[in-house]
Amino acid sequence: MASFGYFLFLCGLSQALSSYPIWWSLAIGHQYSSLGTQPILCGSIPGLVPKQLRFCRNYVEIMPSVAEGVKIGIQECQHQFRGRRWNCTTVNDSLAIFGPVLDKATRESAFVHAIASAGVAFAVTRSCAEGSATICGCDTRHKGSPGEGWKWGGCSEDVEFGSMVSREFADARENRPDARSAMNRHNNEAGRTSIIELMHLKCKCHGLSGSCEVKTCWWSQPDFRVIGDYLKDKYDSASEMVVEKHRESRGWVETLRPKYNFFKAPTEKDLVYYENSPNFCEPNPETGSFGTRDRICNVTSHGIDGCDLLCCGRGHNTRTEKRKEKCHCIFHWCCYVRCQECIRVYDVHTCK
């Protein structure tokens, strides 16, 4: 049944390409890993609007970091949704790497845009701090009186530059006066804002025998997993919006406002959406759902990863699986650990 669902899914891909940020596909294309040495490849990246193409050619040395940023964003999405009905599945042989699932203005679309935008900002910022590009480096603006017992040192990561790159590149195609562009711009910025919110000081001690007479400190990004956890919380509390039309000098413009006035209005840190998500229980070529048949579920969980919810009430199958594992490990002085190899039997539960 899973293969049938995959076939149905592929049938709907052609409908997805028109409104897709298909440049995300550079995250899974090995041919883009050498962008820094082959600028002509900018023209081969699919789906670039003219502004993105100019940016790529002007700043080609940071384009590998842009590709890496989208890649880590996708990987983090798959981690955060690993136990949900929609698990951020990608299709490697398609330009629409998530399929039609992102055609709708749902919570899932909001999260993917936010995490991809954050990934680009994060990867570019980290690359600059590591000295991988000549056009950027460390942030030298965090100077002044730092505090008693420590001073500025090391390399503060320039998240403002990374966010600028993400904003100029990722938002370049979101300039239409419609609600979806407004939603994408907002969620892209929420992704970038998450990094700024989570920046923290890292310090290193200096002195005789580690006495820490003086500390040098610098601003650092968190692990990207922390950003993913933060944005997943924003996904769970995303604000539902409604579309309003206004007539301006340039014509009709669509904007978003909160659907419910008794809830707090979303800030620039929050995710927004205006269309309901499908239930993702069955394969559906129109929504891009793979369904949940044959997905591994947790028989002891009452949460969304549990067999009751993940399998959508269809029940589950159970099979036994033998695995080789290290066991009876003993530490020997000095200094190694010797283990035996054991065969252990596990129950594996999959959705019907």
Curated annotation (Swiss-Prot):
Keyword Transcription regulation: no
Cleaved signal peptide residues: 1-18
GO molecular function: cytokine activity; frizzled binding
GO biological process entries: BMP signaling pathway; canonical Wnt signaling pathway; cell fate commitment; cornea development in camera-type eye; determination of dorsal identity; dorsal/ventral pattern formation; inner ear morphogenesis; limb development
Keyword Oxidoreductase belongs to the record: no
Gene Ontology terms: cellular component: cytosol; endoplasmic reticulum; extracellular space; nuclear outer membrane; plasma membrane
Matching InterPro entries: Wnt (IPR005817), Wnt3 (IPR009141), Wnt_C (IPR043158), Wnt_CS (IPR018161)
Expressed in which tissues: Expressed in cornea. Isoform 1 is expressed in the primitive streak, dorsal neural tube, proximal otic vesicle, the apical ectodermal ridge and the epithelium of feather buds.
Transmembrane segments: none
Keywords from the UniProt entry: Cytoplasm, Developmental protein, Disulfide bond, Extracellular matrix, Glycoprotein, Lipoprotein, Secreted, Signal, Wnt signaling pathway
Covalent lipid adducts (O-palmitoleoyl serine), residues: 209
Record-stated family: Belongs to the Wnt family.
Protein name: Protein Wnt-3a
